[in-house]
Curated annotation (Swiss-Prot):
It comes from Bacillus anthracis. InterPro entries: PsdUridine_synth_cat_dom_sf, PsdUridine_synth_TruA, PsdUridine_synth_TruA_a/b_dom, PsdUridine_synth_TruA_C, TruA/RsuA/RluB/E/F_N. Homodimer. The active site is at D53 (nucleophile). Gene3D superfamilies: Pseudouridine synthase I, catalytic domain, C-terminal subdomain, Pseudouridine synthase I, catalytic domain, N-terminal subdomain. Substrate binds at Y111. This is tRNA pseudouridine synthase A 1. Pfam families: PseudoU_synth_1.
Length: 247
């Protein structure tokens, strides 16, 4: 058996998230459907670095699967991309040992969130950025960002629906990139809780709008209560950008 690692990019707009759900179109469902065709009807389960929600995009999602087929890496890439819909692309394939695991071997993840700061919607970017129609004080946002960096209990910044009991995570970097009419938030951490990036972005936008003081972030973290953080930003501005492994 070969263990195959794939890096996957997808446009999340027309998916109900990554993970299989009955009666809904998902990324995992489409990948496993393509693999089933390649394996003459045999079901092949894939493991991913993590789930993404409905409408969330990925540039660098990572999956693995085990297979009895002996194909070269480029053959896997060509075969899968031929069978996958045009909103999913396999961008890289590597053969790995059994020690590699797409989920449990993750060392760090990078997410990016795009905000279009404009009163006027952009019809061509509407599925890929969060249009924010209010003026923002970028310096206030920059002042708030360092409070999130480091190891914290992020209970205040995750969905109440999370199934994770341990809410402690480490954020290594948060970078705010000003690019034309967009603000791009770049997050690197050892892992992220359910909706965590989107809630942090929503909170930082509140800071930029003057609804929250930048220095209030430590207090919100300490309260460990979701109701004190900002509104969650929508899914379509979020991208799983890159996943790094310890092996």
């Amino acid at each position: 058996m070969d263990r195959i690692k794939c890096t996957v990019a997808y446009d999340g707009m027309h998916f109900c998230g990554y993970q299989i759900q009955p009666q809904h179109r998902t990324v995992q469902q489409e990948i496993e459907k393509a693999l089933q065709k390649l394996h003459k009807g045999e079901l092949v389960r894939v493991q991913a670095s993590g789930r993404t929600d409905s409408t969330v995009h990925a540039k660098g999602q990572v999956i693995h699967f085990d297979t009895p087929l002996s194909l070269e890496e480029w053959q896997w890439s060509n075969a899968l991309n031929t069978m996958l819909p045009d909103d999913i692309v396999i961008t890289q394939v590597e053969k790995k040992t059994e020690e590699f695991h797409a989920r449990y071997g993750v060392e760090r993840k990078e997410y990016r969130y795009r905000v279009l700061v404009s009163k006027t919607a952009d019809v061509f970017r509407r599925n890929y950025v969060y249009q924010y129609p209010y003026p923002l004080e970028v310096n206030s946002i920059r002042k708030a960002i360092p409070y999130f960096i480091g190891t914290h209990d992020f209970t205040s910044f995750c969905s109440a629906k999370t199934d994770k009991k341990d809410k402690v995570r480490t954020i290594y970097e948060i970078e705010l990139i000003e690019q034309d009419d967009e603000l791009i938030f770049r997050f690197v951490g050892n892992g992220f809780l359910y909706n965590m990036v989107r809630i942090i972005v929503g909170t930082l936008l509140n800071v930029g709008q003057g609804k929250l003081d930048p220095d209030s972030i430590p207090e919100i973290l300490a309260k460990q209560n979701r109701q004190f953080a900002g509104k969650m930003a929508p899914g379509h501005g979020l991208y799983l950008w890159q996943v790094n492994y310890n092996n």
